[in-house]
Amino acid sequence: MKNNKLGLRIGIVGGGISGVALALELCRYSHIQVQLFEAAPAFGEVGAGVSFGPNAVRAIVGLGLGEAYLQVADRTSEPWEDVWFEWRRGSDASYLGATIAPGVGQSSVHRADFIDALVTHLPEGIAQFGKRATQVEQQGGEVQVLFTDGTEYRCDLLIGADGIKSALRSHVLEGQGLAPQVPRFSGTCAYRGMVDSLHLREAYRAHGIDEHLVDVPQMYLGLDGHILTFPVRNGGIINVVAFISDRSEPKPTWPADAPWVREASQREMLDAFAGWGDAARALLECIPAPTLWALHDLAELPGYVHGRVVLIGDAAHAMLPHQGAGAGQGLEDAYFLARLLGDTQADAGNLAELLEAYDDLRRPRACRVQQTSWETGELYELRDPVVGANEQLLGENLATRFDWLWNHDLDTDLAEARARLGWEHGGGGALRQG
């Protein structure tokens, strides 16, 4: 086994979930020097609740973050603990079926809580703040990244985990002779809010609505709209996201000068869901001040790597949230790279082959998740060209639709990567002492 005595210098740009998770794992290895650069003055995640499928939970555990996750994660109470979502007709909350995720169910967390739990384990000196990347140069096997504050960092490998508006993505694509890819508006907006679960129970009692709808994750489906709920913060808060889509234009646009997130009124939200049933309306009436999110994603990229710069997470494959899979794909990226880079057989001499394996093995799966996330939104909103509003077909489709996504064996991909690299086994790196 070859040990790189000089070590690998690795920079990570972006302090979201995937960037922090990767930094936490890499800093454990004595042959790696890692620095994490975050543009904001402190760690923090925009958004509210986020759910993770079984594949994402396996990646979290594989990255050594299972304990931190369980401290803040929620799961549906017994006997519904394996339910991912129950599916209901938006007009009257009639039951259409359920999707079961054995052993995991609806595993969810408040984004900020998860980041807070992770960063408490990050060693001092790893993270630097106020570091917005502005330029990247590569020369002689070394990467130089420049920041808007005038500082720079040099490393053997630069990892772009800087989200859908990534500054590093243009460097990667231009290096491949391709035009930059900018986020595209999906035509769907989402009203978001957090509801006190006791308040929601009272509202449902007043309307004669079954309180079971509070206890179990729900998805209400309707034409050009859907509403989801799931508990966070030990069931005390219900995360609510109400999606509404305008399909009048084949290529919708969002005004360049308009924010992606803005405050909205309850009246605006209720008007968008006029004609929906009592359960949906009573739920939305519990949100006095929703925020409106314009949902963007990326086109599938032809490559995630240029030289010694690599993209992960939303920087590489930002997707619509309809499979609850975006954060999970970033964590799969982090797990895949951590397992390879953390091996002492990894060194500056085989980084190119290692990154090629990452691109070849991770990109097709991530692209498929991107595409099916869009298709799933069409299904939820009764616009699937085959299923349409056929409730029997809808229930049958949703019962098994996510199996391929959740049951994927990432370790099989890693075994193939090691075989390509000529590594006979998955030898781990030497752990840093102290």
Curated annotation (Swiss-Prot):
Key words, A-Z: Aromatic hydrocarbons catabolism, FAD, Flavoprotein, Monooxygenase, NAD, Oxidoreductase, Plasmid
Top-rank taxon: Bacteria
GO biological process, alphabetically ordered: catabolic process; secondary metabolite biosynthetic process
GO MF assignments: FAD binding; salicylate 1-monooxygenase activity
Keyword check for Lipoprotein: no
Its EC number(s): 1.14.13.1
Pathway linked to the protein: Aromatic compound metabolism; naphthalene degradation
Residue numbers binding FAD: 9-38
Database matches in InterPro entries: FAD-bd (IPR002938), FAD/NAD-bd_sf (IPR036188), FAD_monoxygenase (IPR051104), Salicylate_mOase (IPR017631)
Names of required cofactors: FAD
Enzymatic reactions: salicylate + NADH + O2 + 2 H(+) = catechol + CO2 + NAD(+) + H2O
Assembly mode: Monomer.
PANTHER family: FAD-BINDING DOMAIN-CONTAINING PROTEIN-RELATED, HYDROXYLASE, PUTATIVE (AFU_ORTHOLOGUE AFUA_3G01460)-RELATED
Protein name per Swiss-Prot or TrEMBL: Salicylate hydroxylase
Organism, scientific name: Pseudomonas putida
